[in-house]
Amino acid sequence: MSCPVIELTQQLIRRPSLSPDDAGCQALLIERLQAVGFTVEPMNIGDTQNFWAWRGTGETLAFAGHTDVVPAGDVERWINPPFEPTIRDGMLFGRGAADMKGSLAAMVVAAERFVAQHPHHRGRLAFLITSDEEASATNGTVKVVEALMARGERLDYCLVGEPSSSEVVGDVVKNGRRGSLTCNLTIHGVQGHVAYPHLADNPVHRAAPMLNELVGIEWDRGNEFFPPTSMQIANIQAGTGSNNVIPGDLHVQFNFRFSTELTDEMIKQRVVALLEKYQLRYTLDWWLSGQPFLTARGKLVDAVVNAVHHYNEIKPQLLTTGGTSDGRFIARMGAQVVELGPVNATIHKINECVKASDLQLLARMYQRIMEQLVA
């Protein structure tokens, strides 16, 4: 017996949509949604394909996701070609199976079933889909959100289909995410010969005490919803490669994953104060890729918890751990945002896979969420 969720997932996997190339995935989704009465507005920007689709009026529940995937890596190490979906022992293998073509298929099939049962639903059901999430994320969801906000669109609830689960579907639901702030720091010195240090100024030596203090800072202790803010040095570089040249500059890149206990401005001020304390000559470049956001217990969280418990008989953990997602852009609209998707154990890995029955379960959960909020 065929399963529409599995079949649609397989159709999507067969399209090698390496970010930001959609490779025809959205055309499949659009065709299915239009067939059940959705109005679809393509919102393509540059090399990125996006669409906004809706059906009905009133309080709005949007489902958000991305059709793009990361590269497959060494295809010889896959048990089957990464863009040829294969089911083995109940597991569906293929790039994007878990992140996040399985979720997209579950969303669309859930919407089809929901509309069939509730053709005159009271609220508005919507989809926000992009092909630019895995790479730069510059022409995707963020641009669609900006356009929707500019024309006064209202979004009350948003379910993002990112693979949130840990062991079984729904055991972890993300009801927020930490902010992400990157600092590109250059410490300036004076290049010279290592045998004549008095004629040079080594930026590595000057910066070492400051960096030592930086990595030891306790930024906050987190709170009920967020773990403590963390700072990690990601890249550090100095020198010419020669063993007899004192470097002229030291380049350090570090990233903060910060909680709602801090703002990006508070972090910036503290870093600058530290640089001034050690009397360093420096250049700073900051990149804020996302503010922290949190969806407290309310109608959306309650609907998600109810759906998970109904079909999997477990109470999900509400967590804010992990990296950033497009939820950070959608939260700007004032919407309640929650992430619920398949198990994330193999995402971005060789032999990415998802339990086929989990996708069927996910479609039922998504449909129940629709029924609770916009039926």
From Swiss-Prot:
It is an enzyme of class 3 (hydrolase). Its EC number is 3.5.1.18. GO terms for biological process: diaminopimelate biosynthetic process; L-arginine biosynthetic process; lysine biosynthetic process via diaminopimelate. Pathway: Amino-acid biosynthesis; L-lysine biosynthesis via DAP pathway; LL-2,6-diaminopimelate from (S)-tetrahydrodipicolinate (succinylase route): step 3/3. The active site is at D68, E133 (proton acceptor). Its cofactor is Zn(2+); Co(2+). It comes from the Bacteria. Zn(2+) 1 binds at H66, D99, E162. Keywords: Amino-acid biosynthesis, Cobalt, Diaminopimelate biosynthesis, Hydrolase, Lysine biosynthesis, Metal-binding, Zinc. PANTHER family: ACETYLORNITHINE DEACETYLASE, N-ACETYL-L-CITRULLINE DEACETYLASE. Homodimer. Belongs to the peptidase M20A family. DapE subfamily. This is Succinyl-diaminopimelate desuccinylase. It comes from Cronobacter sakazakii (strain ATCC BAA-894) (Enterobacter sakazakii). The gene is dapE.
